[in-house]
Every structure is written in structure tokens, then in C-alpha cells.
Amino acid sequence: MLSPSIPALVKVMVFFLTWTCLWLPIAIIVAIALKWQPPQPLGNKKLPLLASLYLIVPFILWATTWIESVSLADWGLFWQPATLISALLGLGLGIVSLAILFGLQLALGWIQLQSSEVETKTSEKTINPWTSILNPSTLLILLLALWISATEELIFRGCLPNLLQQDYSIVIAAAIASFIFAIAHLIWAPKETVPQLPGLWLMGMVLTLARVTDGGSLGIAIGLHAGWIWGITIVDTAKLIKPSQKVPEGITGIAEKPLAGAAGILLLLTTGTLLFMMQK
């Protein structure tokens, strides 16, 4: 184990510096292959770059467990049926919470359904939102959401908080890890992410509470995170909804991003309250 005299924040910085140094050469090769260069919008080129970043994670985490003399179980990843059940519970909670969020906004007239158009045999076009939801690609998106959420939860709700708790209380450690979690999203779309930073930080805190609620396991947190990623990605890619302009975008979400709006913040607070009430 690294000397206890080494500050936890220094360990965290070394973690991310190592990750960045290993990823940059790969990212440059991927970017050249995709013919992308900053500051061009990433668009559909984000996924290959994200994949290259997260494929390095197992090595970084393995090295960290070896250096710190800990196991994945110490970070909340338990290889047992209870973890799968918790993940399914979290996944359901994430999907249902988003359904309630968008359903209430539709009922209040704050947003409008903007469904895909399906041409009938008589050449008439009808609006059918289910063609966007019940699509084979949604399963792929769900699998990607589970991969992303498992990776991020193991890092930001597992590894980092445990490192930080060597010097700080669990609350302060969670707050710092959630801040890093929020800031890390700036790498992909800085302009869109800035209004979401408070929401992303709060999301990190809620997901930390999910781990506490699950007795230290990351199961609920992974499922909950995946449910949110999956639901929001489906809505975004299929362009299912649009603001009605009846309320300021600060309510529904700046640039149509739920985490950048009061409604999304309320969703996180409500979820956090529910998790607190569920604590084992």
C-alpha cells in the first residue's frame, strides 16, 4: 500500500494523470481514424472515443487494487446474486422515475411529444412514439448504458470515495468524488455540460446514497445510473419530446437537458429521499 502520509487528493490526481497519459495516444489514433479534431462537435464520434477511454479502466483499477492492497469488494462490487437483484431494482427505479418526470411535464403542458412519423399503406403519416422506444437498437443502448454505468460507478462511487476517505469523512469524500464526476463530463461537450454541472454533482451524491442504501454494494447505483442513461439517450436520439415554451427552459432543462433544469433537480432530490427511506 502507498504510504499513508501521501495525501488522498494526491493519490486521486495520480490516478487520473495515469489514466490520461495511457489514453491520450489511443485517443489521438482514434481521432485520426475518425477524421475528427477539436473543436469540432463530436456527434456520433463520441462513442468510439468513449470506448477507448473506458477500455483502459480495468487495467487502471487492477493496478490501484494492487497498490492499495484492496479488492473490488472493498469498492462495492460483489460477485453475488444480490448485486444483480439490486441492479435490476435500480434499473427499474431509474426508468420509472424518468417516465414520471416526462409524464408529469407532458400532463402540465411543459413539453410536447414529438414522435417519429410512420407512413401507412394509404400514404398517410401518423405519429407513433413506440416506433422509437420499441426498437432493436434500444437493447444495444441498454447494454452500453450498463457498461458505462458500471465503469463510472466503480470509479466515482467505489474507488475514489474509498481513497478520499483515508483523509476525509464519507460526506466530504462523496462531495469531492461527485465534483470530479461532474467536471469530467466537460471533456465531451463543454458548452452543453456547464449548465448541467450542479445537476451532475447532485446526481453523484444521489448515486453515493444509493450505495449506502444498498449496504455498501454498487448494485442499486449501477442500475439506477444505467436506467437514467438509457432513458435520456432514447429520448435524445429519437427526439421524442420538445419544450412547449410555456415555461422557461430553466424549468424543463436548458438545451433540453433534464439535469440543467429545475424538474431534473427535483427528480434527483425525490430519488434521494426515496433512497434514504429505503436504507437497510
Question: What are the roles of these predicted feature ranges?
Answer:
Residues H185-T193, G215, G219:
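Membrane-interface helix caps and helix-loop-helix hairpins in membrane proteins
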Residues Y54-F59, L140-L144, D167, G199-V212:
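Small-residue-rich segments of transmembrane alpha-helices in multi-pass membrane proteins
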